[in-house]
UniProtKB/Swiss-Prot annotation:
Source domain of life: Archaea
Keyword Transit peptide in annotation: no
Cited SMART domains: Ribosomal_L40e (SM01377)
Organism of origin: Sulfurisphaera tokodaii (strain DSM 16993 / JCM 10545 / NBRC 100140 / 7) (Sulfolobus tokodaii)
Annotated protein name in UniProt: Large ribosomal subunit protein eL40
Pfam families membership: Ribosomal_L40e
UniProt-recorded Gene Ontology molecular function terms: structural constituent of ribosome
Gene Ontology CC: ribonucleoprotein complex; ribosome
Gene: rpl40e
Length: 56
């Protein structure tokens, strides 16, 4: 069921996409993080902003 309400869509996008991913261990961190919460590495990248395509 796709979301049509723009306010709810914006809330969902912020909850899903505003994260950083550790390149060493793959842990999700907050967007303000400078070090990984799990392995304390500084090698973080922003999470990709696209949903993966469905197979099938």
């Amino acid at each position: 069921m796709p979301l049509t309400d723009p306010v709810k869509l914006q809330i969902v996008q912020q909850r899903i996409f505003l994260k950083k991913v550790c390149r060493d261990c793959g842990a999700l961190n907050s967007v303000r993080a400078t070090k990984c919460r799990r392995c304390h590495s500084k090698n973080l990248r922003p999470k990709k902003k696209e949903l993966p395509a469905k197979k099938g």
